[in-house]
Curated annotation (Swiss-Prot):
Record flagged with keyword Heme: no
GO biological process terms, semicolon-separated: translation
Family: Belongs to the bacterial ribosomal protein bL28 family.
Domain of life: Bacteria
A GO molecular function held by the record: structural constituent of ribosome
Organism encoding this protein: Ligilactobacillus salivarius (strain UCC118) (Lactobacillus salivarius)
Any one Gene Ontology cellular component term annotated for this protein: ribosome
Protein name in UniProt: Large ribosomal subunit protein bL28
Region listing for Disordered, in residue ranges: 1-26
Record-linked InterPro entries: Bacterial_rp_bL28, Ribosomal_bL28, Ribosomal_bL28/bL31-like_sf, Ribosomal_bL28_bact-type, Ribosomal_bL28_sf
Swiss-Prot/TrEMBL keywords: Ribonucleoprotein, Ribosomal protein
HAMAP family associated with the record: Ribosomal_bL28
Organism phylogeny: Bacteria, Bacillati, Bacillota, Bacilli, Lactobacillales
Length: 61
């Protein structure tokens, strides 16, 4: 399962509740994109969330 290289965000799991309070499993997935960034001075392709890209936590190479 893919995980954000910068923030560590990954798929979270929970329940979907209907009006009758029935429950089924569901998941929330972060919007991950594979991008090239500098890691220890070398370019590397890693999974990064779009939230981290928009906030400027990483810069593309």
């Amino acid at each position: 399962m893919a995980k954000d290289f910068v923030t560590g965000r990954k798929t979270t799991f929970g329940k979907k509740r209907s009006h009758a309070l029935n429950q089924t499993n569901r998941s929330w997935k972060p919007n991950l994109q594979k991008v090239r960034i500098l890691v220890d001075g070398k370019p590397k392709k890693v999974w990064v969330s779009t939230r981290a890209l928009k906030s400027g936590k990483v810069t593309r190479v």
